[in-house]
Curated annotation (Swiss-Prot):
Classification via SUPFAM superfamilies: Ribosomal protein L10-like
Lineage of origin: Bacteria, Bacillati, Cyanobacteriota, Cyanophyceae, Synechococcales
Known partners and oligomeric status: Part of the ribosomal stalk of the 50S ribosomal subunit. The N-terminus interacts with L11 and the large rRNA to form the base of the stalk. The C-terminus forms an elongated spine to which L12 dimers bind in a sequential fashion forming a multimeric L10(L12)X complex.
InterPro entries: Ribosomal_uL10, Ribosomal_uL10-like_sf, Ribosomal_uL10_bac, Ribosomal_uL10_bac_type, Ribosomal_uL10_CS_bac
Protein family (similarity comment): Belongs to the universal ribosomal protein uL10 family.
Pfam families assigned to the protein according to its UniProt record, in alphabetical order: Ribosomal_L10 (PF00466)
Name of the featured protein: Large ribosomal subunit protein uL10
NCBIfam families noted in UniProt: PRK00099.1-1
Job of this protein: Forms part of the ribosomal stalk, playing a central role in the interaction of the ribosome with GTP-bound translation factors.
Gene3D superfamilies reported in the protein's UniProt record: 3.30.70.1730, 6.10.250.290
GO cellular component entries: large ribosomal subunit
Keywords, sorted A to Z: Ribonucleoprotein, Ribosomal protein, RNA-binding, rRNA-binding
A Gene Ontology molecular function term of the record: structural constituent of ribosome
Amino acid sequence: MGRTLESKKQIVKKIEDLLDNSEMALVLDYKGLSTKEMSDLRSRLQQSDGVCKVTKNTLMRQAIKGKNSWTGLDSLLTGTNAFVLIKGDVGSAVKAVQAFQKETQKSETKGGLFEGKLLSQDEIKAIAKLPSKEALMGQIAGALNSITSKIAIGINEVPSGLARSLKQHSENGES
């Protein structure tokens, strides 16, 4: 027996809520994946604030209707789709999906959408190569620490240089 209209509305509402909180969406062809493999993918995605949802394309169309930033997904809504919705560390989530696909050899990424722009396979791979949020924060912190160290050394050098000049001048004056 099919779903009731009320249950379909609830599903669409849940998807809308997920989309409202997501930065990126990937569309995967999940044909051939077992329940265990889907559970594995979902657990990998949880670590980077990603969610994998399997829903009918018509329900996803209803959820993206009227949402300008997500309407690009419409062109990917054919066949058997799983939707990976990412709200946190986009790079880590894409890496998790790609690692999963490499291990299982059963699913492929049809495409993705990031900030309203439809992404090609190459662009999705490029996102996966980006460093994680933690690594970027570490690099920024290191750069800021380097700048403050150089400023401190520079400020300290002015009086030291002045003292050396005065000492040299006084030695030259005595001779």
